[in-house]
Amino acid sequence: MPYRRTENVARRLAARHDAIIAAARQIAGEGGMAAVQIASVAARAGVAAGTVYRYFPAKTDLIATLLEEIAEDEIGALRRAAGGAPGPLSALSAAIMTFAARALRERRLAFAAIAEPVDAELDAARLAFRRSLAAEFGARITAAIAEGRLPEQDAGMAAAALTGLLIEGLIGPLAPDASGREREVVQSLTLTALRALGVADARARGLVVQTVMPADVRAP
């Protein structure tokens, strides 16, 4: 029937779109956004360059879509981790550790998505990612304050500072080499973040015991 043919075509188009984005993500993880070129993405995805252009008229369109999908993946991971926690402070800790673990697992990709210099027209997508991260952390901070688990503070400002702390501590030029000591880095950064928010005894409370390590994290 015609509608079945239409459904099959739609599935093929969606699968090709996903393959192109997956190829771009792999390349960005290997060489950064500068390495994401139409020709290299087409070759990795097993399609012609013209096919990529049919989906994405310009390279900036491809990278903007890639940034949006990376942001969706990371925000989704934070929400799932926080949603499985028993309380607001545990949820905040879980969100911090999840972001840190995933960033360490794909450090080159994280740098490409958040901090690597890009064309001016891509700044909006990158800023949206940072704002989404800050909003997620802000929601967890607000919930913890409301239940008396954190001292009163400006949740928006605290979330912005937390986002900056994590980015600089994990993928910025001053970030330490985490090779071979990923668990230590994730726990140390989480403890630092929680202390900055007013939790001096986070380790004693067991807030960093269930650290999910980069090798254990799987993309959704």
Predicted features, each with a name:
Residues 1-4, 135, 139-146, 175-220:
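C-terminal peripheral helix-coil segments that are non-catalytic and often amphipathic
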Residues 19, 27-61, 65:
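Helix-turn-helix
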Residues 65, 76-108, 159-162, 186, ...:
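Hydrophobic alpha-helical connector segments
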Residues 72-76, 105, 121-147, 156-171, ...:
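Amphipathic alpha-helical packing segments from all-alpha helical-bundle domains
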Residues 81-85, 110-117, 169-177:
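Secondary-structure edge/capping motif, primarily at the C-terminal ends of alpha-helices
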Residues 103-121, 138-139, 205-211:
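Amphipathic alpha-helical segments used for helix-helix packing
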